[in-house]
């Protein structure tokens, strides 16, 4: 499935080391590592989204800036949130993305990923790593761009665009509606409730 595969790829580009390695090198390196793990893991290939989520938590989550991602998704409503609410929003947003993309990760079957040359200056604080993917059964490549920021702990991903569409800002309208109707606490409760729902997969298989 093209959409599921693209969603999976959005979480395949974290930093392998805290040292300041070139962002495109890091993206390719960790993508290759995670992709190889998936292909060899019969449980994930068989649809075990719990195991897929564990892989995401271990290999990918530490290298995303979920606070900035939540801030982008919340837009102007972020400024109205207290520090405690902001922390809760970032946490629930992280869990939501992990759960969402773990169901997509099991669809990866070794599709080819090509990377574009990085166009950035040494002093740049933010860069875009561009790639193209050729999903199985499709002749049309899918562009996937990773937006990264330089931090004291290395490069962190704060957004991903699939065919030019941000997978973070796609939540903006839904979040705005929730805040308008139920307030920020209502949005947090709504996200928490969704995150408590069963994954609806072969999770838990041992």
Q: Where are the model-predicted features located?
A:
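Early exported N-terminus immediately downstream of N-terminal targeting peptides
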Residues: 20-101
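Low-complexity, acidic/polar, glycine-enriched regions of mature
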Residues: 132-134, 148, 185-188
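Surface-exposed, charged secondary-structure patches
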Residues: 99-141, 194-206
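Low-complexity, intrinsically disordered terminal/linker segments enriched in charged
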Residues: 159-206
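Positively charged n-region of N-terminal signal peptides that target proteins for export
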Residues: 1-4
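Sec/Tat signal peptide C-region and signal peptidase I cleavage site
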Residues: 14-19
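Surface-exposed, polar/charged faces of alpha-helical domains
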Residues: 21, 25, 36, 40-47, ...
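Short beta-strand edge/turn micro-motifs at domain boundaries
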Residues: 141-169
